[in-house]
């Protein structure tokens, strides 16, 4: 049985929560996020807290309640503080630049790679080999970071490619004669 769902999500005073049937909307200084809640989960909003419990008749009720609680907690953190994800470009001639909502990258291909950012996500390049993604939605930030990394994954022999800042790339030893 999940114990995650038993802990309530505390809502700060500057965050507004609206519960409309199975759709919950959370609004804060960094924007507004909404999500549809699984039908097996019952959400109650009282005393600046969100509490989660399974509905009767669902086998996976506690599991869904725990998942929903984690998603709601991420939404509250997103609209108050926001999320960041850092990427590094490792390789000779690999560089990135941001123009509006488009990230332009040179990754060793015969053409530059342009990636358009979705709404609510901003990017900046502190240096030519670093990309910092910022936004309120944790899932969208992770998805965009994964898409950028997929253009040129770190290869195992020299480690060249696009990697997360906290990623450790295991380098293989070259074949010996």
Swiss-Prot record:
Top-level division of the source organism's lineage: Bacteria
Keyword set, alphabetical order: Ribonucleoprotein, Ribosomal protein, RNA-binding, rRNA-binding
PANTHER family listed in its UniProt record: 60S/50S RIBOSOMAL PROTEIN L6/L9 (PTHR11655), LARGE RIBOSOMAL SUBUNIT PROTEIN UL6M (PTHR11655:SF14)
GO terms, biological process: cytoplasmic translation
Quaternary structure annotation from Swiss-Prot or TrEMBL: Part of the 50S ribosomal subunit.
Family stated for the protein in its record: Belongs to the universal ribosomal protein uL6 family.
Cited InterPro entries: Ribosomal_uL6-like, Ribosomal_uL6-like_a/b-dom_sf, Ribosomal_uL6_a/b-dom, Ribosomal_uL6_bac-type, Ribosomal_uL6_CS
Name of protein: Large ribosomal subunit protein uL6
Encoding gene (name): rplF
GO cellular component: cytosolic large ribosomal subunit
Keyword rRNA-binding annotated: yes
Role noted for this protein: This protein binds to the 23S rRNA, and is important in its secondary structure. It is located near the subunit interface in the base of the L7/L12 stalk, and near the tRNA binding site of the peptidyltransferase center.
One family name in Pfam for this protein: Ribosomal_L6
Keyword match Ribosomal protein: yes
UniProt GO MF annotations: rRNA binding; structural constituent of ribosome
């Amino acid at each position: 049985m999940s114990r995650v769902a038993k802990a309530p999500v505390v809502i700060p005073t500057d965050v507004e929560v609206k519960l409309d049937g199975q759709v919950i909307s959370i609004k804060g200084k960094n924007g507004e996020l909404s999500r549809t809640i699984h039908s097996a989960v019952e959400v109650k909003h009282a005393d600046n807290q969100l509490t989660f419990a399974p509905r009767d008749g669902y086998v996976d009720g506690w599991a869904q309640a725990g998942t929903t609680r984690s998603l709601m907690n991420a939404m509250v953190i997103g609209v108050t503080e926001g999320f960041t994800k850092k990427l590094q470009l490792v390789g000779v001639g690999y560089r990135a630049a941001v123009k509006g909502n488009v990230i332009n990258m040179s990754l060793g291909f015969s053409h530059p790679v342009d990636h358009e950012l979705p709404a609510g996500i901003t990017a900046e390049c502190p240096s030519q080999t670093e990309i910092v993604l910022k936004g309120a939605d944790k899932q969208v930030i992770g998805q965009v970071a994964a898409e950028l990394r997929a253009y040129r994954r770190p290869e195992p022999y020299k480690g060249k490619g696009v990697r997360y800042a906290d990623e450790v790339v295991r380098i293989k030893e070259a074949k010996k004669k």
